[in-house]
């Protein structure tokens, strides 16, 4: 076990993490030059396009060090985005060390810090690396100072490298061997392995990526998942050298994959512990307790997804089921809306996660979707003392029954160059943020705010990027539920409530948002043969109204001169017809109208 090193790479988006992983794989001969391609570990199209890593991937590499020994290096590539922080913490807990990659021209950014703290909390050894040293504007001294200031680890011996040109790769590998500890664990005890990630393969079922902590798992043994208590036989196991390579057994300290022909991903939960089913003469028996750190992930953001054609509901359900195979943190349940028909209420980890799920549904499964405005989970205390959780505005009880509503509050860390502090603070205050702290680290400023999650969900991230010209970065973590004066604003069209357009907002903004949504609807809904009234209401109080004028035919065109009563008769007849139409007519709300709410400015 002394010759094994498990490490991962922590970096902010675009700091060159995946490119560095490519270079390390190339240097260790994991793939021949013919098979090498850019960002080898980011296998989904969407990962490539957005330049982000979503699922954790691994590579088991052989490296011959300068001391002549051959070491087994297991590189575990982690996602960098705050939405996937649970996957990051699983990947990191499977490692003993991490390379902290910082772009020498940009310095430390928010997600680097968040993930680095996770690593330090888990007791992982962090080795700083300064990437992109080949750029003319690289400033290594400033980057080192920021690492020491912001993260508080010693950066004197940070390794300069350039993943693009391949400079400094050997130094990094030597540092991995010299500075990171070998894995701990009992190679002869009852086997325990942690599931770092799992995904669904069309041919073999669920593939589990595991880090074996104690003991040995062999082909053909029956294993038990400790969180779900289900038992499966091992059909194949092996390692990825990015390509998959079958082995007979995985030993303590190794990272590899196990395939058991499992049909549904729910059985293999990320973070769960795998052990043997029962004691047999030739094995060490099942483990007594699971590895620490497993938790069920709770979605933070909810939105409705509906097919554009009612007939495609079944396809959407299939698509969601398949996507869920690869994404255990996605939750969904069927719901019916009067306006949109049958669809699903989906729960996501955060906004990026939501966008990615939508995009994968559209791209990989060819679905046309309508998405309702994202909302968060509110705790509602009723007059009787019961507390219910409401994640869908249309499920909010009537005003008279509610004692208080509590909304989720998050702590937000914002990092930006000091030139942008003013605009960012203005934005945070508009979003009901309460400033907790402000710290200067060299040229960077870190602001800490408490904010309602509901305010972040809509468009905070986009606005933050625009007021700071893309320089600010953020991450957030859930803090608590806190009582707040929020109300549900209903949108009525000709007196009928359209449930998919309901929004929950703070009372101070309710008038403004109600007016803005009504105005938006007026632009989107086509003119009918009769007047259409669009109203925004809180309970029974109407707070805003817009009218769409009727289309009318000029019934007087054929009258020349003559008596006024003749004209009046024709106008009255038209009016009576319009009134009759209005009683039986229903207004079609077009798809665009539902999307338009998402773009309502504050």
UniProtKB/Swiss-Prot annotation:
What keywords sit in the KW lines? Cell inner membrane, Cell membrane, GTP-binding, Hydrolase, Membrane, Nucleotide-binding, Protein biosynthesis
Q: Which SUPFAM superfamilies match?
A: EF-G C-terminal domain-like (SSF54980), P-loop containing nucleoside triphosphate hydrolases (SSF52540), Translation proteins (SSF50447)
| An example Gene Ontology molecular-function term | guanosine tetraphosphate binding
Q: Which positions fall inside the tr-type G domain?
A: 2-184
Gene Ontology biological process terms, A to Z: positive regulation of translation
Q: Which InterPro entries does its entry note?
A: EF-4, EFG_III/V, EFG_V-like, EFTu-like_2, G_TR_CS, LepA_C_sf, LepA_CTD, LepA_IV
GO CC terms of this entry: plasma membrane
Q: Which Gene3D superfamilies match?
A: 3.30.70.240, Elongation factor 4, C-terminal domain, Elongation Factor G (Translational Gtpase), domain 3, P-loop containing nucleotide triphosphate hydrolases, Translation factors
Cellular localization per UniProt:
Cell inner membrane
- Entry-linked SMART domains: EFG_C
Enzyme Commission number(s) of this protein: 3.6.5.n1
Which residues of this UniProt protein bind GTP? Answer: 14-19, 131-134
Checking Pfam families in the record gives:
EFG_C (PF00679), GTP_EFTU (PF00009), GTP_EFTU_D2 (PF03144), LepA_C (PF06421)
Instruction: Tell me how this protein sits in the membrane.
Output: Peripheral membrane protein
Q: Which reaction does it catalyse?
A: GTP + H2O = GDP + phosphate + H(+)
Q: What does this protein do?
A: Required for accurate and efficient protein synthesis under certain stress conditions. May act as a fidelity factor of the translation reaction, by catalyzing a one-codon backward translocation of tRNAs on improperly translocated ribosomes. Back-translocation proceeds from a post-translocation (POST) complex to a pre-translocation (PRE) complex, thus giving elongation factor G a second chance to translocate the tRNAs correctly. Binds to ribosomes in a GTP-dependent manner.
Homology family: Belongs to the TRAFAC class translation factor GTPase superfamily. Classic translation factor GTPase family. LepA subfamily.
Q: What is this protein called?
A: Elongation factor 4
- Write down the species: Leptothrix cholodnii (strain ATCC 51168 / LMG 8142 / SP-6)
Gene symbol here is lepA
């Amino acid at each position: 076990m002394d010759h094994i090193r498990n490490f991962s790479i922590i970096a902010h988006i675009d700091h060159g993490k995946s490119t560095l992983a490519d270079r390390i794989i190339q240097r260790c001969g994991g793939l021949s030059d013919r098979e090498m391609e850019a960002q080898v570990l980011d296998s989904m199209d969407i990962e490539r396009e957005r330049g982000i890593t979503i699922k954790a991937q691994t590579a088991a590499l052989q490296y011959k060090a300068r001391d002549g020994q051959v070491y087994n290096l297991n590189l575990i590539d982690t996602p960098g985005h705050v939405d996937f922080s649970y996957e990051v913490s699983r990947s990191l807990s499977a490692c003993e060390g991490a390379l902290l990659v910082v772009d020498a021209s940009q310095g430390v950014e928010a997600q680097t810090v968040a993930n680095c703290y996770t690593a330090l909390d888990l007791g992982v050894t962090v080795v700083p690396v300064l990437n992109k040293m080949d750029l003319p504007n690289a400033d290594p001294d400033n980057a080192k100072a920021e690492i020491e200031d912001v993260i508080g680890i010693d950066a004197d011996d940070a390794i300069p490298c350039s993943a693009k040109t391949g400079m400094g790769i050997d130094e990094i590998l030597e540092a991995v061997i010299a500075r990171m500890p070998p894995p701990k664990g009992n190679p002869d005890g009852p086997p325990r392995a942690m599931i770092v990630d799992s995904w669904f393969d069309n041919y073999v079922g669920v593939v589990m990526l595991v880090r074996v902590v104690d003991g040995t798992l062999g082909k053909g043994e029956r294993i038990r998942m400790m969180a779900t208590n289900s038992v499966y036989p091992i059909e194949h196991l092996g390692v990825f050298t990015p390509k998959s390579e079958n082995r007979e057994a995985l030993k303590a300290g190794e990272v590899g994959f196990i395939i058991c022909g499992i049909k549904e991903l729910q059985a293999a939960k990320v973070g769960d512990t795998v052990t043997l089913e029962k004691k047999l003469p030739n094995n060490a028996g099942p483990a007594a307790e699971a590895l620490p750190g497993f938790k069920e992930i709770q979605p933070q953001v909810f939105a409705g997804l509906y097919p554009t054609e009612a007939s495609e509901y079944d396809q959407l359900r299939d698509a969601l089921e398949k996507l869920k195979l690869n994404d255990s943190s996605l939750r969904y349940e069927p719901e019916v809306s009067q306006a949109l028909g049958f669809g699903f209420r989906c729960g996501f980890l955060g906004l990026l996660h939501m966008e990615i799920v939508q995009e994968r549904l559209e791209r990989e499964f060819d679905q046309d979707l309508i998405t309702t405005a994202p909302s968060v989970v509110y705790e509602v205390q009723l007059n009787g003392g019961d507390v219910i959780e409401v994640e869908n505005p249309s499920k909010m009880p009537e005003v008279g029954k509610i004692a208080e509503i509590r909304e989720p509050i998050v702590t937000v860390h914002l990092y930006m160059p000091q030139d942008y502090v003013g605009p960012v603070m203005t934005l945070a205050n508009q979003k009901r943020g309460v400033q907790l702290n402000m710290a200067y680290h060299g040229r960077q400023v870190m602001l800490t705010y408490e904010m309602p999650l509901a305010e972040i969900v809509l468009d905070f991230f986009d606005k933050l990027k625009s007021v700071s010209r893309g320089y600010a970065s953020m991450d957030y973590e859930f803090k608590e539920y806190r009582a707040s004066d929020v109300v549900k604003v209903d949108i009525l069209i000709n007196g009928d409530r359209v449930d998919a357009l309901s929004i929950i907002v703070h009372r101070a903004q309710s008038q403004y948002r109600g007016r803005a949504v009504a105005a938006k609807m007026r632009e989107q809904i086509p003119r009918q043969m009769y007047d259409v009234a669009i109203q925004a209401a809180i309970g029974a109080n109407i707070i805003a109204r817009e009218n769409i004028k009727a289309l009318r035919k000029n019934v007087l065109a054929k009258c020349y001169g003559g008596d006024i009563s003749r004209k009046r008769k024709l106008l009255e007849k038209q009016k009576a017809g319009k009134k009759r139409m209005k009683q039986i007519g229903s207004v079609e709300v077009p798809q665009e109208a539902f999307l338009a709410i998402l773009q309502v400015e504050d």
